[in-house]
């Protein structure tokens, strides 16, 4: 029951003022006020960013927008989620410059992917120069989906994904967050809301095929199903199928709610995905370690060459000290020795 009404808990606590602890009431009231303010600015701020990028001829693809708020019956219940944009490396730098001009500041970096920027008003934007997936397979499949992105109406350079591909992106991200114990209930709520709103429009055969390409068709189906069980009814069928073994969902629920503290994973796709992520992380750590070694070796070599050039200066410099070298160049080694001996004697005097 709690999970079924979790999306309206803020309003529920506000309406039960006598029994609710004061600290809870204050926090929920602050959260609700933030949601109200965000609702006033999000559409304008999003259009402002996209219009500016479009006028600058900067091509970008919208991965997520605040448009999901329109799918909630009460808009303030939706999360204050950021606008998420994917750009190529060249456009990324230009877009960041435009955002800085609009008053956005970098709040945190996504190592190897992009950064999170926010403005004092509260609106936030994520910009990526690389698809934010920790697995190469997911990145490759997502790049295929981006090829189907369509130009957004009223824009020339701003693209958006079809509804099926938007849903696939959220499912792929949720699968990654699940196996790394970072999946939030809010993400599942958004998936449920989207599935219920777009169910009639979704090409389920296409979605299942693409999920198979991601190798998460079974795992993604379970995540959508458990979101329906939490926020809808247990009778909701995902992709036309009803679950046979309800114990599977107890495993998912325990892992998600405990953030991995209670983990008895039985899903083979989840186990394989976790192995892939760990391999990518190991590969990235090895790459960074190798990069540090190369950087240190380069610095050592530069120090060595500087010392070497001090001991054995170039020919033109030596000619300025010993003009005879211009007529007899083969005396250069003897001049080096003579100069270095004089310098050493000068140090010991």
Please tell me what each predicted stretch does.
Residues 1-81, 87-349:
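Conserved NTP-donor binding/palm subdomain of two-metal-ion nucleotidyltransferases/polymerases, i.e.
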């Amino acid at each position: 029951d709690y999970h079924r009404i979790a999306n309206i808990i803020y309003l529920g606590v506000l309406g039960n003022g006598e029994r609710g602890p004061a600290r809870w009431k204050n926090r929920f009231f602050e959260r609700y006020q933030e949601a109200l303010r965000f609702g006033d600015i999000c559409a304008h701020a999003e259009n402002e960013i996209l219009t500016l990028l479009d006028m600058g001829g900067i091509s970008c693809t919208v991965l997520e927008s605040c448009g999901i708020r329109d799918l909630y019956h009460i808009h303030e219940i939706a999360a204050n989620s950021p606008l998420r944009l994917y750009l190529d490396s060249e456009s990324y730098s230009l877009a960041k410059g435009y955002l800085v001009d609009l008053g956005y500041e970098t709040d945190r970096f996504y190592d190897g992917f992009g950064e999170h920027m926010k403005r004092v008003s509260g609106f936030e934007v994520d910009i990526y120069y690389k698809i934010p997936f920790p697995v190469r397979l997911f990145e490759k499949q997502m790049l295929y989906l981006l090829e189907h992105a369509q130009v957004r109406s009223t824009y020339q350079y701003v693209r958006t994904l079809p509804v099926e591909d938007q849903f696939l992106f959220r499912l792929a991200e949720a699968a990654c967050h699940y196996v790394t114990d970072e999946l939030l209930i809010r993400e599942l709520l958004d998936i449920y809301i989207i599935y219920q709103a777009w169910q009639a429009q979704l090409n389920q055969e296409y979605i299942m095929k693409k999920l198979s390409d991601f190798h998460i068709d079974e795992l993604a189906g379970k995540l959508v199903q458990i979101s329906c069980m939490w926020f809808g009814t247990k009778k909701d069928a995902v992709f036309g199928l009803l679950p046979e073994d309800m114990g599977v969902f107890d495993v998912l629920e325990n892992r998600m709610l405990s953030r991995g503290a209670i983990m008895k994973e039985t899903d083979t796709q989840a186990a394989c995905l976790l192995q892939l992520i760990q391999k990518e992380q190991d590969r990235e750590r090895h790459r960074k370690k190798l990069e540090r070694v190369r950087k240190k070796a380069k610095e050592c070599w530069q120090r060595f060459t500087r010392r070497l050039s001090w001991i054995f200066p170039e020919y033109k410099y030596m000619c300025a000290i010993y003009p005879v070298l211009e007529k007899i160049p083969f005396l250069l080694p003897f001049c080096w020795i003579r100069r270095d001996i004089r310098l050493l004697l000068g140090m010991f005097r």
